[in-house]
């Protein structure tokens, strides 16, 4: 933990809620050791402030040794590292290969649905996707560590309710309502809007390089909020990225909790949850560079980096070289039609602070 005020508050919360480097639980007559690690890729995307993360391989080796010394018979690693189709880039496979003694790695971060576990260096690597869509079940022999059964059980409206988990969820909701939302006059289940059609969750086809109705709503909302605040009636471009959109909306009432689910990352200097919005002016030539990053990086290299625009569109050719795919870009006027971007003209752009912090790197690109 860092020494600044926020980091120390995080440390206190960690301690108050029973946080620990590792834990041993007794189940079925066996001692099961648990520990967690943070992956390199997830650290890269984390707004960690002054907090630092030690090398996960060294941490894992240390934890395995401690757990064995304290009598753990099965060792489970909760990993926010993830897997990759390319095993040389698959962090949890690398972890299993480099650290002996881990029996199971429950893999997170990449939201991978592993229909069959990966077996590497006597370690079972499992992953049940994201957002509670599946319940993962791995049954192994506690003595031989051989796999007996593995299932991904879909969580649907017909799934039986676990009363213990349901009570815990209600406890958390009451805590959020009383200690956070109440000061703004809201509750988690309060309806604040309605949609007569579903807004698509980007995770329905995360690798697809295509438009998204939820992203359209978010970027349009950015523009609307900007105009309310600045009283500027000129056309404005809204910009966000796939990686910070966390869910869609189903048809019907829109609740406070659902809005938070969709845009729940970050925090502003005022202490409010969510990345604050920022309004900047960008030259047309830089807008074209942003479009190029979207096409070359968001489509071909980093799925999380796909960008979504309100008030701007561009045309590209797949037959051109990387970082040179974009043919032209256009912005939408208040009259609703599109006109070509002028390279030397300044255009108002509203985005969130996370995206804004990445924009300076655009000017360093050469293409």
Q: Predicted segment positions?
A:
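Solvent-exposed loop/linker segments at secondary-structure transitions
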Residues: 139-366
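Acidic, metal/ion-coordinating pockets
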Residues: 1-158
């Amino acid at each position: 933990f860092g020494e600044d005020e926020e980091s120390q508050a995080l440390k206190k919360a960690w301690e108050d809620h029973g946080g620990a480097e590792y834990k041993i639980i007794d189940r079925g007559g066996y001692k099961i050791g648990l520990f967690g690690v943070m992956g390199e890729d997830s650290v890269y995307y984390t707004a960690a402030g002054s907090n630092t993360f030690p090398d996960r391989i060294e941490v894992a080796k240390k934890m395995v040794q401690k757990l064995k010394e304290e009598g753990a018979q099965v060792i489970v690693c909760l990993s926010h590292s993830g897997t990759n189709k390319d095993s040389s880039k698959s962090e949890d496979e690398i972890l299993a290969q480099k650290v002996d003694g881990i029996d199971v790695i429950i893999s997170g971060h990449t939201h991978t649905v592993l229909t069959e576990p990966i077996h590497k260096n006597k370690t079972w690597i499992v992953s049940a996707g994201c957002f509670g869509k599946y319940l993962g079940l791995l049954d192994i022999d506690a003595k031989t560590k051989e796999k007996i059964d593995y299932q991904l059980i879909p969580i649907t409206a017909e799934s039986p309710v676990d009363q213990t988990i349901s009570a815990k969820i209600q406890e958390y909701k009451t805590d959020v309502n009383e200690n956070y939302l109440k000061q703004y006059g809201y509750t988690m289940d309060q309806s604040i809007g309605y949609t007569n059609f579903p807004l698509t969750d980007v995770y329905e086809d995360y690798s697809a390089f295509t438009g998204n109705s939820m992203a359209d709503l978010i970027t349009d909302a950015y523009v609307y909020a900007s105009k309310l605040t600045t009283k500027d009636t000129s056309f404005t471009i809204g910009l966000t990225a796939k990686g910070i959109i966390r869910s869609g909306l189903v048809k019907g009432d829109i609740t406070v909790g659902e809005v938070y689910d969709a845009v729940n990352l970050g925090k502003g200097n005022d202490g409010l949850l969510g990345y604050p919005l920022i309004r900047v002016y960008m030259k047309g030539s830089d807008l074209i560079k942003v479009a190029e990053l979207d096409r070359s990086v968001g489509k071909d290299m980093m799925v999380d980096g796909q960008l979504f625009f309100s008030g701007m569109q561009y045309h590209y050719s797949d037959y051109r070289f990387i970082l040179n795919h974009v043919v032209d870009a256009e912005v939408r006027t208040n009259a609703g039609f599109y006109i070509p971007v002028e390279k030397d003209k300044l255009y108002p752009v509203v985005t969130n602070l996370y995206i804004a912090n990445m924009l300076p790197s655009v000017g360093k690109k050469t293409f």
